[in-house]
Design a protein with these regions (language model features):
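Noncatalytic, beta-rich nucleic-acid-contacting surfaces in large DNA/RNA-processing enzymes
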Residues: 1-355
Length: 355
C-alpha cells in the first residue's frame, strides 16, 4: 500500500531534484568552462524538441558572452562541433547538405591534396584546382557558401564565381590544369596559358574550345557583377546551411551609427534614454484583461543585434498600433526608448524607424 501511496508524490519530487541538479551543474559549467559548455550543448542540440531554435538561442547567448561560434575549419576538418585552439567550431556534420560519404570524400581529397602542396599554407587557387572537381558540385558549393573556406582569405562570391568558371572546362583541360597549375598564381593566368593549341604548350584541342576558354578568362578579368561579399547574403546563406548566421548579424547590413547602445549593454544594466539598431526576431501581441489598460492591445518584442538578443522590449497601446506593421521577423529597425522601471533589461518604446 505505501508504494502506491508514495507514487502520488515521489515521481514529481524525483524529477524536481533531477532538474535542480542538472541546472546546478549546467550553470557551473557555463560559468567555469564556457567554451566546453556551448560546444557540448550545440553538439547534442539535435535531441531537443526544436533543434533549430535551440541552436539559434545557444549561438546568440554565446555571442552575448563574447564567445563566437565559427564555421567548420578547413585546417582541421572537424566532423563534430569542437573546441579548437580556444574557439568553438561547428562540425562538417552541421552543414545540412553534406552526408557521411561526402564528408569522407572531402577529408580524403584534402589529405591527398596536402601532399602535393609546396607549403602547408593553403590558398583558394590550390583548393579549386586540386579538390573542387574531385568532390561533387553540391559539396564544393556548400564548403564555399557556408564559410568553411573563409580562412583562404578570398570572398565567397569570388570563390563561387571561379568555381563555376572552372566547372566549364573539359576533363582534358582540367587534367592540363592539374599538371601545370604550379606555374601560375591565379585561375585567370592559368586559363590564358591553357587557351593555346597543344602544340604550343596549351591545353585546348580545337578552335572552338580556344574561343570558349579565352572568353572564360576575359569574364574572370572583368566580372559582370561585384564579387564582394554582402553581409545580408552571408546571413541568409549561413541560415540555410546551419539554421543560424555565424559570421554576421542581420544588422551588419545596415547603418548602426544612429544607435547609442547594444543588446549586451542593456542586459548588463545600462539605464536612461536609449537608441538601438536591432533585428526583429519575434513580435507578440498581448491584451490585458485587468487594470487601466484592460482591453487595449500592447506588444512585446524579441530583438537581436551583433552582441546578443533580448526580449524585454515593450510597446504600449499607442506605440503598438503605430508601429506594428513594421515589426515582422527579420526586419531591421531603430528603436528609440528608455529603460523600464523595474526591469533591468527592459525597454519602453517611444519611436521606431524602419531601416
Amino acid at each position: 500500500g505505501w508504494i502506491e501511496a508514495s507514487s502520488r508524490y515521489s515521481f514529481n519530487k524525483s524529477h524536481a531534484v533531477s532538474y535542480a541538479i542538472c541546472a546546478y551543474w549546467s550553470a557551473y559549467a557555463k560559468a567555469h568552462f564556457p567554451l566546453e559548455f556551448y560546444c557540448n550543448y550545440l553538439k547534442y542540440s539535435g535531441g531537443k524538441p526544436d533543434p533549430q531554435r535551440e541552436v539559434k538561442e545557444l549561438v546568440t547567448d554565446a555571442k552575448s558572452n563574447d564567445i563566437f561560434i565559427h564555421p567548420p575549419s578547413l585546417e582541421y576538418l572537424n566532423e563534430e562541433t569542437s573546441v579548437i585552439n580556444g574557439k568553438v567550431y561547428f562540425g562538417l556534420k552541421n552543414i545540412k547538405s553534406l552526408g557521411a560519404n561526402t564528408i569522407i570524400s572531402i577529408k580524403e581529397n584534402v589529405k591527398d591534396a596536402r601532399s602535393l602542396l609546396a607549403s602547408e599554407i593553403w590558398c583558394w587557387y590550390d583548393f579549386l584546382i586540386l579538390i573542387s572537381r574531385k568532390i561533387n558540385k553540391t559539396a564544393s558549393r556548400a564548403l564555399i557558401s557556408s564559410g568553411v573556406l573563409s580562412e583562404l582569405k578570398t570572398s565567397r562570391q569570388k570563390m563561387l564565381y571561379e568555381f563555376d568558371t572552372f566547372e566549364k572546362l573539359s576533363n582534358k583541360e582540367v587534367e592540363w590544369a592539374e599538371e601545370n597549375y604550379k606555374n601560375f598564381n591565379s585561375l585567370v593566368d592559368l586559363l590564358r596559358s591553357l587557351a593555346r593549341p597543344r602544340k604550343e604548350g596549351g591545353g585546348v584541342t580545337n578552335k572552338n574550345r580556344l574561343g570558349i576558354v579565352n572568353d572564360l578568362a576575359q569574364q574572370l578579368e572583368n566580372p559582370p557583377v561585384s564579387l564582394q561579399d554582402d553581409p545580408e547574403w552571408i546571413v541568409r546563406t549561413e541560415e540555410n546551411y546551419y539554421g543560424v548566421a555565424l559570421t554576421y548579424s542581420k544588422v551588419d547590413s545596415v547603418d548602426v551609427s544612429r544607435g547609442n547602445t547594444t543588446c549586451k549593454d542593456i542586459l548588463n544594466g545600462k539605464k536612461g534614454n536609449l537608441s538601438i539598431v536591432v533585428t526583429v526576431n519575434e513580435a507578440r501581441k498581448y491584451t490585458p484583461i485587468k487594470g487601466k489598460n484592460a482591453g487595449k492591445d500592447m506588444g512585446f518584442l524579441e530583438v537581436e543585434d551583433a552582441t546578443g538578443s533580448m526580449d524585454g522590449v515593450t510597446l504600449f497601446y499607442d506605440a503598438w498600433y503605430k508601429y506594428k506593421n513594421m515589426l515582422y521577423n527579420g526586419n531591421n529597425i531603430l528603436i528609440i526608448g528608455k529603460t523600464s522601471g523595474g526591469k533591468r533589461d527592459g525597454i519602453i518604446v517611444d519611436e521606431i524607424f524602419e531601416l
